Amino acid sequence: MEVADPSRAPPEYKDVAWIADTCKLLMGIGWTTNYVGMIYKSLKDETYAMALMALCCNFAWELTYALIYPFGSDLEMYVHFSGLMLNCGVMYTAVKNAHREWGHSPLVLRNLPLIFIICVSGFMSGHVALAAQVGPSLAQAWSAYGCQLLLSVGGLCQLLCRGHSRGASYFLWFSRFFGSLVLVPQDILRYKYWRVDHEYMGSPLYIWFVCIFLLLDGSYGICLWYVRRFERQTAVAHKKKK
C-alpha cells in the first residue's frame, strides 16, 4: 500500500519511479527468501528463527493489512497475501518448536499457546488503532517501521540470550537485512522528488529509525560470527577432553 496515490506523483518523480519500483521488488525478493529460509531452518534445527514478540507483531501486521485494510491493486494484494501465507509457515514452526527453547522457564513453557494468542491479538489491536488514528495508508508504513525495529532488537536479543546459533544463519540475516535496507534508497527518492507527500522521511524520527536499524542489524552479523566462533571453540575443547 502506497502512502500517497501514485497518480499524484510529480513528473520529476515519475522519471525515477522505476528505480523505486525496483527497490520494492528487491525488498519482496529479500523477504520472501527470508521467510522460506526461516521455515526451512526452523524445521531443520527444530527451533524457531524469529523472536516471538517480533514474529507476533509482524504476523499481526500482515493480518491487519490483508484482512481489514487490504491492499488496493491486484498485484499488491497478490504479493501481500503471498507474504501472509509464508508468514503462516513461519508462525507454524514457532508454535511447533517454541517449547524446545523454553525449558528454563516453566511459566512461559506452560502458557505458550496463550502467549501467542494474546501477543498477536494485542499487536493487531495496536495496528488497527493506529490505522484509525492516522489512516491506513500512513499507518501501514509507520507500523512497519515499528515491526522492523522490534524484529531487529528481538533477533539480536534472542541470539545473545540463547547462546547458540540454531535457527540462525548468515543467509537469513543477510536476506532480512537486504530486504529492509533496499527500501532506504526508495525513501530517499520519494523525499527528494515527491516531498509534499513524504515530508516525514526527512524528520529526525525517521533518520533515527534508519540509524538504529543499521546499528542493530549490522551488530547482528557481528554477534552471529562471535557465537559461531564460540561454538567451534567449545566443540574443539570438548573433543580434546575425550
Curated annotation (Swiss-Prot):
Report the record's Gene Ontology biological process terms: terpenoid biosynthetic process
The residues the entry assigns to the signal sequence are none
Give the matching Pfam families. Answer: Pyr4-TMTC (PF25129)
Membrane association type: Multi-pass membrane protein
InterPro entries per the UniProt record, alphabetical: PaxB-like
Q: Is Repeat among the key words of this record?
A: no
The answer to keyword Transmembrane applying to this record is: yes
Query: What GO cellular component term, any one, is given?
Result: membrane
User: What sections of the protein cross the membrane?
Assistant: 15-37, 51-71, 75-95, 112-132, 141-161, 169-189, 205-225
Report the PANTHER family cross-referenced here: PTHR42038, TERPENE CYCLASE AUSL
Recorded protein name is Terpene cyclase dpfgB
**What organism does this protein naturally occur in?**
Gibberella zeae (strain ATCC MYA-4620 / CBS 123657 / FGSC 9075 / NRRL 31084 / PH-1)
User: By which gene is this protein encoded?
Assistant: dpfgB
